[in-house]
Amino acid sequence: MNARIDTGNEAFSAAELATAESRASATPMMEQYIEIKANNPDSLLFYRMGDFYELFFEDALEASRALGITLTKRGQHMGQDIPMCGVPVHAADDYLQKLISLGFRVAVCEQIEDPAEAKKRGAKSVVRRDVVRLVTPGTITEEKLLSPSESNYLMALTRIRGSGEALLALAWIDISTGVFRLAETEASRLLADILRIDPRELILPDTIFHDPELKPVFDVLGRTAVPQPSVLFDSASAEGRIARYFGVATLDGFGTFSRAELAAAAAAVAYVEKTQIAERPPLGKPERESAASTLFIDPATRANLELARTLSGDRNGSLLKAIDRTVTGGGARLLAERLMSPLTDPARINARLDSIGFLIDEPLLCGNLRDTLKHVPDMPRALSRLALDRGGPRDLSAIRQGLDAAGGVAVMLGKAVLPEELGQALSELQALPATLEKLLAETLAEELPLLKRDGGFLRDGANAELDEVRALRDQSRRVIAGLQLQYAEETGIRSLKIKHNNVLGYFIEVTAGNASPMTETADAKARFIHRQTMANAMRFTTTELADLESRIANAADQALTIELEAFDRMTAAVVAEAEAIKSGARALAVIDVAAGLALLAEEQAYCRPQVDGSKMFAIESGRHPVVEQALRRQAGGPFVANHCDLSPKTGDRDGAIWLLTGPNMGGKSTFLRQNALISILAQMGSFVPATSAHIGIVDRLFSRVGASDDLARGRSTFMVEMVETAAILNQASDRSLVILDEIGRGTATFDGLSIAWAAVEHLHEANRCRGLFATHFHELTVLSEKLGRLSNATMRVKEWDGDVIFLHEVGPGAADRSYGIQVARLAGLPASVVARARDVLTRLEDADRKNPASQLIDDLPLFQVAVRREETARGASKVEEALKAMSLDDMTPREAMDALYDLKKKLK
């Protein structure tokens, strides 16, 4: 009997178990376990024993803590108790889900022979077992373990060095849908590309994993990054490995790939082969992505804008949640993919917009399509499970239902003149095999079991031999009912019943008090053979009942054999059409996304953006797509729409920059974010929340909005702000869109103002990008006098009877106040503190009026023409003395500027 033991006990590690001494002292069963565990040291080993998967030693300690299950012991090994825990086989998926979500990897070890076969090899022979599958976060296919709306990518990263340069490449595979893509990348954008694709598991050579230059990337990814032996990423054998997987002699028909891309793709394929053991998922041919084909969004921007999840990790409140009107799993995944990877090709963007516009103009068709799509199961994932021999009757049914719905969608679309994208989708739907749908419809029953081993999934009439066996089974049931009546009359025991269990099979049961007619005479004893006595009942059998049981058992076995053979034939027929099914499923997803975005545009009054290769950025009455919907749900009144025009001014080639000032709580951050989100929506191929929008392609989007520290990496809030700002200033191009909110606020006033001033100049003169720059440094507004493409804008307010009303409207001009004290009063600061703050503010403003910031603009040349003069020893000495005497943190902005004038005089 298993006894509970202390979960804090130490246990043998995998390395300790693998020693010769350990193996020599193990029982035959434990020796087998140790050998299998030694081959899978980085995985929890689910060791099959009857109806349970059991875990031992260190695995048991980890699993019991992670799963919250009882830790017991099973005998001893080398004088120590063996920790053990287990999970039922029928509930294994639930436990796997939790372990995978916690980042564990699991090796599933099954019995590959039954005990009877083991005994033939010797009375003490151990049943043969082996690992049939490695379950890792990036290689799962079970429906319970997957999110219907999210892809489940395995990604491989590799690096090839040559001609003084290191080329990085990524390959990513979703074995649950067959998606297979690859792309080159650079160290500077590696994290951004990984987060864009959002893999569940990233494999990489251990040499890269320990590279100091890339360590910050893997620190962010945490347990997602899994180092592997470098041999897995060998570029010399890469092409051959991929060709063998797809059964082709050459990859010439797949396209042209770099050595780094091939190495990454081959590593991903090798890892799939390693984890799936003997099975092979039906992967699509590898497709190459170009970095220039998608809008670059750096990691900080992706997080700040809360595209797929909020900063707290919640899907609710994200842009994806706000725009998702899809009704299929494939559609939801495609929508997320498009949102995370907006395009930079106007032609492809406009093709998507054409589809949405067409369905808006055809509301009846759009509604009918969505009604049909609601009944489309997840065909790609059902296909993958069937191909990997993990499927069941309901997966076959999913293929049948999907093919049937696809036929209905094709009929609807076939009656219309379609735009390009929908026309291509229709062609793929029309290419689906009608004979396969007919086969499945004529073969599968209406009500289906979860597991094929349960049988009963073939409809009556589908197989003549099966019908005969079922008739025998049904006839036997009638015979049993007749025997029960016969035995009751023969013995005079009206309560006599014929029952069945897995131990005795069929048996006669009577109460102990009524059993005498079956036990008193020799004839009765010969006829009714005693099987079992219980507290209140006795059980018997007869020769004819035993014969009938044998016939029924044989019929059931024969029926299941027939059904399993039919299942294998149907599965083979489905897998043979894998490419067509995946293409058809993708077409349904495209239609679902277009119909969902059409519905969104209609219900939220979105407009079609004009997207082209210009540098325009003109938004009329733009709104924040997430905040607007939240206000409607909360009955909080209408969202205040605002214009934004960063288009090149007359005579200029480059876009404009708005310097936005205004009060706290005035809506600056919302305005900044909404314009970034509108650009993303437009380039993903969606209508946008505005009355009109003209957007020239943005190649890179940067958003520095909000503030947070990074304590784990020893970074203060200000340091994080500066790192992110540095990335923007170093990477933004003249086609980029830059959104900056209150740069410099995290340090002393003088320092912060100086940094913000220089950043605005750099964006204008060096980056020459389109941008929105929000600030509370009102001194910066004087820059509009010297920077031709810089305009001032402000959040309007109204003062009424001592109170301030935030209008949330953007207009031209500069704010003269930030109304911070009014906000402090609204927040509940003590009245005495508010009064004192007003007094201090009045004194500071009086001092500031004596030395207006406009004087500073004449004394500070633009950074790009400023020539740093060599300081004389005498001048430098005076400046140093003056600087040492200053207390910068105690200075007001006005005092800081006065100090600048004095320092300059000392340098002359």
Swiss-Prot record:
Keyword list, A-Z: ATP-binding, DNA damage, DNA repair, DNA-binding, Nucleotide-binding
Molecular-function GO terms, alphabetical: ATP binding; ATP-dependent DNA damage sensor activity; damaged DNA binding; mismatched DNA binding
Coiled-coil regions listed in the entry: none
One matching Pfam family: MutS_V
List of residues binding ATP: G662, P663, N664, M665, G666, G667, K668, S669
Keyword Nucleotide-binding annotated: yes
GO cellular component: cytosol
GO BP terms: mismatch repair
Keyword check for Ribonucleoprotein: no
HAMAP family assigned to the protein according to its UniProt record, in alphabetical order: MutS (MF_00096)
Family: Belongs to the DNA mismatch repair MutS family.
Name of this chain's protein: DNA mismatch repair protein MutS
Source organism: Rhizobium johnstonii (strain DSM 114642 / LMG 32736 / 3841) (Rhizobium leguminosarum bv. viciae)
